Design a protein with these regions (language model features):
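Conserved, well-ordered active-site substructure
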Residues: 1-6, 11, 17-59, 66
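Short beta-strand elements bearing conserved aromatic residues within extracellular beta-rich modules
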Residues: 18, 98-100, 187-189
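Short, solvent-exposed loop/linker segments at the N-terminal edge
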Residues: 70-76, 159-165
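Low-complexity "stalk/linker" and mucin-like segments enriched in Ser/Thr/Pro/Ala/Gly
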Residues: 101-118, 155-157, 182, 190-207
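A short beta-strand micro-motif common to beta-rich folds, especially ectodomain repeats
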Residues: 125-136, 212-213
Length: 213
């Protein structure tokens, strides 16, 4: 770190319990941004706080777009959303005349509704660069990936369910060690024992007690 130009370095707990929380652009809430070993922030902890004393200006600067850097299968419908950011980094309304568009290098990756931001992926794989435009100027950008699975497995050999319970059966779908969002129909499900339940998309729904004879 010193070689990179740091003058002072603090070494905190480097274990898996370390928790990072931040207020991301477009939000007024502090949220945990990593995956601590306990699954959540500990009730008792030592903390280092970085607090901004800036005040909202109410002057629009740019739009923060989500999702970002997520993976989806071909044909997936992705709903993009935007939050306005003022010059001090505080949330504000997005200009009413702002519209959605695909960047020139992504126009062959699918279609996007200019008003709603609903993107429908095509059959190609690769990066999709999405823009928000106002008055011919790009005021926000984000990107997602369209990919196919290279690893599909279950996290558990058995799953116990009650009547009418729903479960994803601990299915994990990944591409290059990253979680991949799949749509209904991407996986064809079969059961060795009929009558125990049905699939609703990629979710298994156990039958009710009355349905068993």
């Amino acid at each position: 770190y010193m070689a990179e130009g740091a003058k002072d370095v603090l070494v905190l707990d480097g274990g898996a319990s370390a928790t990072y929380a931040a207020r991301i652009e477009g939000s007024d809430k502090l949220e945990v941004r990593n995956s601590p070993s306990d699954g959540a922030e500990r009730e008792v902890c030592s903390s280092l706080l970085i607090v901004s004393t800036a005040k909202s200006t109410g002057v629009f600067d740019h739009a923060s777009l989500t999702p970002n850097n997520d993976l989806y299968t071909p044909g997936y419908e992705v709903q993009f959303s935007a939050s306005g950011i003022d010059t001090a980094g505080f949330p504000m309304a997005v200009p009413a005349d702002a519209t959605w568009a695909l960047a020139d290098d992504s126009k062959d990756m699918g279609t996007i509704d200019a008003k709603t931001g609903l993107f429908k992926a095509g059959d190609k794989t690769g990066t999709v660069n999405v823009q928000m435009i106002q008055g011919g100027k790009v005021i926000g950008t984000t990107a997602v990936e369209i990919a196919v699975p290279d690893n599909i497995y279950f996290n558990a050999e058995e799953v116990s369910l009650g009547f009418e319970d729903e479960s994803d059966l601990s299915l994990v779908v990944r591409n290059k060690d990253r979680d991949l969002n799949i749509k209904d129909g991407d996986i064809v499900w079969t059961m060795s024992t009929e009558g125990l339940g049905t699939f609703k998309g990629n979710t298994f729904v156990a039958h009710s007690k009355d349905s068993l004879h």
